Design a protein with these regions (language model features):
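Nuclease and nuclease-like effector domains acting on nucleic acids or nucleotide cofactors
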Residues: 2-115, 124-186
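Short active-site segment of divalent metal-dependent hydrolases/proteases
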Residues: 121
Length: 186
């Protein structure tokens, strides 16, 4: 009995320590943490598909990582490999993707047909785990998910090269990634 109590106390202390470490790290969370979708009333199809290939701005308005500012881009987004340090694990994004496919009311419910994409990309300091910055972007259609990746890379290059401010790039991609480059003259 005494050993069981001691193991319970040690396990609880370890779990508490991990939770505190995850909070202290800012972007780390337990891999088993269940994602919380944006608060919406109603059931399935609470998000509109009318703006595809863009997300519903009510469900997915975008969100920023507070560690990334114009002053910190030299030590964050402009450092090669930095996004890998903040990218959420697939266990988190896959669970969120399944929830959001239902919220968007997609008739195709196969998660493989969607990329759980950051509206404001990690390359521009988008919030890594905020459900308001993530959405199930279709991998099919006239402008599939991989089309946006090229825009993200060009915007990051322009921001890191000093041709566009971080705020301008974030605003352009969040409002309409299909016109972001032309709006910024890139």
């Amino acid at each position: 009995m005494m050993i069981r109590q001691r193991l319970t106390v040690v396990a609880a202390a370890t779990a508490l320590g991990l939770a505190v470490a995850g909070l202290a790290g800012g972007t780390a969370q337990a891999a088993t943490a269940k994602p919380k979708p944006p608060a919406k009333s109603g059931a399935a199809a609470s998000c509109s598909r009318a703006r595809l290939p863009l997300p519903d701005p009510t469900c997915t308005p975008g969100a920023y990582n507070p560690a990334v500012t114009q002053a910190t881009i030299g030590s964050t987004i402009c450092v090669s490999g930095w996004t890998a340090t903040v990218r959420p694990p697939a266990s988190y994004t896959n669970a969120l993707k399944t929830q959001q496919i239902a919220q968007y009311g997609f008739s195709d419910t196969n998660p493989a047909d969607y990329e759980e994409d950051h509206l404001v990309p990690l390359e521009l300091g988008g919030a890594p785990r905020d459900p308001h910055n993530l959405w199930p972007e279709p991998r099919y259609g006239s402008q599939p998910a991989q089309s946006k990746d090229q825009v993200e890379n060009k915007l990051k290059t322009a921001v890191c090269g000093g041709r566009v401010s971080l705020a301008a790039a974030r605003g352009a991609i969040a409002s309409d990634w299909t016109t972001a480059l032309s709006r910024l003259g890139l």
